[in-house]
Every structure is written in structure tokens, then in C-alpha cells.
UniProtKB/Swiss-Prot annotation:
Subunit structure: Component of the TIM23 complex, at least composed of tim23, tim17, tim50 and tim21. The complex interacts with the tim44 component of the PAM complex.
GO biological process: mitochondrial genome maintenance; protein import into mitochondrial matrix
Keywords: Disulfide bond, Membrane, Mitochondrion, Mitochondrion inner membrane, Protein transport, Translocation, Transmembrane, Transmembrane helix, Transport
Record protein name field: Mitochondrial import inner membrane translocase subunit tim17
Cystines in this chain: C8-C75
Topology versus the membrane: Multi-pass membrane protein
Pfam family, one: Tim17
UniProt subcellular location: Mitochondrion inner membrane
GO cellular component entries: TIM23 mitochondrial import inner membrane translocase complex
Gene Ontology MF annotations: protein transmembrane transporter activity
């Protein structure tokens, strides 16, 4: 069991805040550029600021909800699996998160959202494992050369 991480309630809050910040910052950049480009020539700065104020907080909230739900499901799955740490936790948490976020759209939307999110998390986990194995192979230590033998000295 990993004792270096915070307990699950704090991990959930931390992940929610981090996801909200990522969404708000990304939304500021995205909607700022979009508002700037779609405004008339003399009002581009005002158009960018207006677009940021209208849309960036909503995008931050959407990212925050996703991060909070994912972290909640991840902690719940770890608890159900006796605190086992492996990629299946993230894949299952992604499955439940995608399904929960799409459940208002009906059964098919929930199913497709769950499968899509699980596949996305499986790809992310697979790439992470691949990079770990690739980088671990580059750091293997070579055995040192044996010391010279003393046969000539004894003869």
C-alpha cells in the first residue's frame, strides 16, 4: 500500500481543484483566442475578454466535475479491490466516470461514454507503461569488469 499519498478524501479534493484549474486556464487561452478572432477589428480585445468571462469558468467547472468524479470512482475502486494499485483502477474509474457523465442522455449515450472513456484511459495507461519499460531499459547498469587476476604474480 502506498503511504506517500494523501487519504482519498483529500486526493479527491486535490484532483477536483487541479482539474478545475487546468480547465479554467485552458478555457482562458482557447476562448480568448476564439473571441479575439471572431470579433470586429476595433473590438478584438473586448471580444476576447468577454468570451473568456463567459466561457472559461464553465469549461473549468466541466473539467473539475470530470476530475472529481474520476478521482471518486478511482478511490472507491481501490477500496473495493483492497487498495490494489494497478492500471485497472484507472480504466474502471474512467468507465464509470464516462457513463455517469453521459447518463442524462440515455442508455446508449451512457454506454458509449463509458466505453469511450475506458478506452481513452486504457490507451493512456498503456502508453505510460510502454514509456516506463522503454526508459527502464536505458538505465540498466552493466556489470563491472572483474579485477585483474594475480596469477602472474604467484608464478
Amino acid at each position: 500500500m502506498d503511504h506517500t499519498r494523501d487519504p482519498c478524501p483529500w486526493v479527491i479534493l486535490n484532483d477536483f481543484g487541479g482539474a478545475f484549474a487546468m480547465g479554467a486556464i485552458g478555457g482562458t487561452i482557447w476562448h480568448g483566442i476564439k473571441g479575439f478572432r471572431n470579433s470586429p477589428y476595433g473590438e478584438r480585445r473586448i471580444g476576447a475578454i468577454t468570451a473568456i468571462k463567459m466561457r472559461a469558468p464553465a469549461l473549468g467547472g466541466n473539467f473539475g466535475v470530470w476530475g472529481g468524479l474520476f478521482s471518486t470512482f478511482d478511490c472507491a475502486i481501490k477500496g473495493l479491490r483492497n487498495h490494489k494499485e494497478d492500471p485497472w483502477n484507472s480504466i474502471l474509474a474512467g468507465f464509470f466516470t464516462g457513463g455517469a457523465l453521459a447518463v442524462r442522455g440515455g442508455y446508449k449515450a451512457a454506454r458509449n461514454g463509458a466505453i469511450g472513456c475506458a478506452v481513452l484511459l486504457a490507451v493512456i495507461e498503456g502508453v505510460g507503461i510502454g514509456f516506463q519499460k522503454m526508459l527502464a531499459g536505458a538505465t540498466k547498469l552493466e556489470a563491472p569488469a572483474p579485477p585483474p587476476s594475480n596469477e602472474k604474480v604467484l608464478a
